[in-house]
C-alpha cells in the first residue's frame, strides 16, 4: 500500500479502531472499523481485527458475511475466519461444505494447543451431526473430550447421557 492509496480520514479511523480494539473498547472499535472499511481491500491485518471486533460485539452473522465477500482472497485467510465459515456451514447443515472448510482449516492451523483443540472439536461435531451418531476418536484433550461426548450424547438423546453428565460434574 502506498501513501497515495490511503485516505487521511480512513487512516485516522483505522488507527482509532486499533487503539480501541487493543484497549478492549469493543463498541468504539467496531464503530471506527466501520468508518474505515475501505481499507479492507488495502490492509491484510484490517479484516482480521474487524472480524474479531464484530464477533466480540455479537455480530457474528455480519462477520461471516464480510469473510464470504473476501473469501477467495488468499491474503485474508486466517484460522478464525475459517472457524466461523465452518460453524456457519455446519449450522446450515451444508456438511460437504463444512468438510471442505475443515480440510482447509487443518492446513491453516498451527501447532498451538488452542487451534488443535478447536479443530478436533469441530471435526467431532461435524461427524456427529452428519452421521447422526457419535464416532469418537480420542484427542489429547481428555477434559474437552468428556465435555464434547456428554453434549453430543445429549444431542443424540443417548441413554447414557445422564451417566456422562454425572461423570462430567464429579
Model segments located where?
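Residue-level signature for tetratricopeptide repeat
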Residues: 19, 52-53, 88, 122, ...
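Alpha-helical adaptor scaffolds
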Residues: 51-56, 67-72, 120
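Long, low-complexity, polar and repeat-rich extracellular regions
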Residues: 18-21, 92-93, 152-155, 170
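Alpha-helical repeat scaffolds
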Residues: 1-2, 28-35, 60-74, 95-109, ...
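N-terminal leader/linker segments that initiate helical-solenoid repeat arrays
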Residues: 1-50, 56, 64-65, 77
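Generic helix N-cap/helix-start motif at coil->alpha-helix transitions
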Residues: 5-13, 40-47, 74-84, 97, ...
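Structural motif corresponding to the intra-repeat A-B loop/turn of tetratricopeptide repeats
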Residues: 23, 57, 92, 128-131, ...
Amino acid at each position: 500500500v502506498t501513501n497515495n492509496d490511503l485516505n487521511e480520514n480512513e487512516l485516522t479511523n483505522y488507527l482509532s479502531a486499533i487503539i480501541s480494539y487493543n484497549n478492549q473498547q469493543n463498541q468504539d472499535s467496531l464503530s471506527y472499523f466501520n468508518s474505515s472499511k475501505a481499507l479492507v481491500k488495502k490492509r491484510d491485518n484490517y479484516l482480521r481485527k474487524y472480524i474479531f471486533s464484530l464477533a466480540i460485539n455479537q455480530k457474528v452473522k455480519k462477520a461471516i458475511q464480510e469473510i464470504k465477500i473476501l473469501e477467495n482472497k488468499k491474503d485474508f485467510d486466517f484460522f478464525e475466519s475459517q472457524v466461523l465459515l465452518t460453524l456457519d456451514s455446519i449450522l446450515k447443515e451444508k456438511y460437504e461444505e463444512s468438510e471442505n472448510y475443515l480440510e482447509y482449516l487443518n492446513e491453516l492451523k498451527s501447532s498451538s494447543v488452542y487451534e488443535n483443540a478447536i479443530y478436533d472439536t469441530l471435526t467431532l461435531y461435524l461427524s456427529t451431526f452428519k452421521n447422526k451418531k457419535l464416532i469418537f476418536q480420542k484427542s489429547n484433550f481428555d477434559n474437552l473430550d468428556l465435555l464434547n461426548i456428554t453434549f453430543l450424547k445429549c444431542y443424540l438423546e443417548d441413554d447414557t447421557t445422564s451417566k456422562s453428565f454425572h461423570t462430567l460434574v464429579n
